[in-house]
């Protein structure tokens, strides 16, 4: 699960009975860096909080994490990734990093952010941007263990929106993305 670092401000642990109704309780949790081997996880310095209430999180740096929580007799592990638009490389090892901040251009004129990349070396990425039947832009770029971030602002020539196409091949495998922004 990829999460934009600036948007993850709170978490909430739902503690429910069999009928799905919230019940009082406390939860112990800790957030630790993800490990490649399950045996390497060490859980200590737990934080205790009330269940069913928003819990403010301290700012965290980009990276891969595990949330380990205990509530009653239940134990939950959730892995997640935090990243920012300022990251220059994927924060995890991945052949395919693609992120689009929204599928709609904001009415206030602010941009939609696009990130494309991989932790692999030597990629040749090709792309095209269409509005209806009109080609707006085509191009390519080379990158190695990096992310390319673009700010896309709405332009009148886009009409009802644009379609983005990005693709690259690595070790005989095609990675491609087609997304629309209205």
Pin down the residues of each PLM region:
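A structural signal for beta-strand and strand-to-loop patches characteristic of beta-rich domains
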Residues: 1-182
């Amino acid at each position: 699960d990829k999460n934009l670092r600036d948007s993850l401000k709170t978490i909430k642990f739902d503690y429910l009975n069999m009928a799905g109704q919230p019940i009082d309780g406390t939860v112990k949790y800790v957030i630790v860096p993800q490990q490649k081997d399950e045996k390497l996880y060490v859980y200590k310095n737990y934080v205790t909080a009330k269940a069913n209430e928003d819990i403010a999180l301290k700012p965290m740096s980009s990276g891969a994490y595990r949330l380990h929580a205990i509530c009653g007799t239940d134990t939950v592990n959730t892995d997640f990734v935090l990243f920012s638009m300022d990251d220059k490389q994927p924060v995890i090892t991945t052949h395919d990093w693609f992120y689009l901040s929204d599928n709609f251009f904001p009415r206030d004129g602010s941009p939609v952010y696009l990130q494309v990349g991989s932790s692999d070396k030597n990629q040749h990425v090709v792309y095209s941007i269409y509005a209806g039947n009109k080609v707006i832009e085509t191009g390519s770029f080379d990158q190695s263990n990096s992310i390319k971030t673009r700010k896309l602002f709405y332009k009148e020539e886009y009409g009802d929106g644009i379609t983005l196409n990005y693709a690259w091949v690595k070790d005989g495998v095609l990675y491609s993305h087609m997304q629309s922004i209205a």
